[in-house]
């Protein structure tokens, strides 16, 4: 049973008039569309059968590109939304992300691997909740953009250990640079 924690592909940062952390947020850049297409190829090799995505434009489009390429359903899930900064505590982000993860994990036992398309901050909080310590995450953050534990259109694979009490967490996909 696998869950993939997926960060949206690269947004178009030229839209400075569009707030980044308030829906809809900026659309994908042309680079982001290519990253999402590469993510689709990877997820097909992993047998992902369903996606849930945040309601932000960049996550919606990432999910739509993957869904169309792989002919799998995708469903909006508000709990995967971007961290709302000062309006939302880390405890709240952790609770909503863990709730969504737990529901998806139960579902993947019945249907197969599922992808959750979200944002770097919420994925960071969830990875810590699942057992990665902050020092290890800091190493990943230095590889990307100092605040995110995975690149745009990157994927963490989450599997239950044999003892059923902990998780195997692996950064499985980094899109090729273009």
Regions found by a protein language model. Give the residues of each.
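Active-site-proximal alpha-helix that buttresses catalytic centers in soluble enzyme cores
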Residues: 2-76, 83-88, 92-94, 152-153
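Beta-strand elements within well-structured catalytic alpha/beta cores of enzymes
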Residues: 2-6, 52, 112-122
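Acidic, low-complexity terminal tails and accessory targeting/binding regions
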Residues: 42, 86-91, 110, 128-178
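Active-site signature of alpha/beta-hydrolase-fold catalytic machinery across serine-
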Residues: 65, 125-129
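Internal catalytic-core helix/loop-beta-alpha segment
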Residues: 87-111
């Amino acid at each position: 049973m696998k869950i993939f924690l997926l960060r949206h592909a690269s947004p178009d940062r030229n839209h400075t008039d569009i707030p980044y952390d308030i829906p809809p947020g900026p659309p994908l850049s042309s680079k982001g569309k290519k990253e999402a297409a590469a993510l689709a190829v990877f997820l097909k090799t992993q047998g992902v059968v369903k996606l849930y995505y945040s309601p932000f434009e960049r996550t919606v489009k990432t999910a739509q590109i993957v869904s169309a390429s792989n002919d799998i359903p995708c469903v909006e899930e508000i709990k995967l939304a971007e961290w709302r900064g000062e309006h939302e505590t880390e405890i709240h982000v952790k609770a909503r992300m863990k709730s969504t993860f737990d529901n998806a994990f139960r579902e993947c036992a019945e249907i197969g691997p599922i992808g959750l398309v979200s944002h770097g901050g919420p994925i960071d909080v969830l990875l810590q909740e699942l057992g990665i310590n902050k020092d290890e995450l800091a190493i990943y953050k230095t590889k990307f953009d100092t605040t995110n534990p995975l690149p745009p259109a990157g994927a963490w694979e989450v599997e239950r250990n044999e003892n059923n009490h902990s998780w195997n967490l692996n950064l499985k996909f980094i899109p090729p640079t273009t």
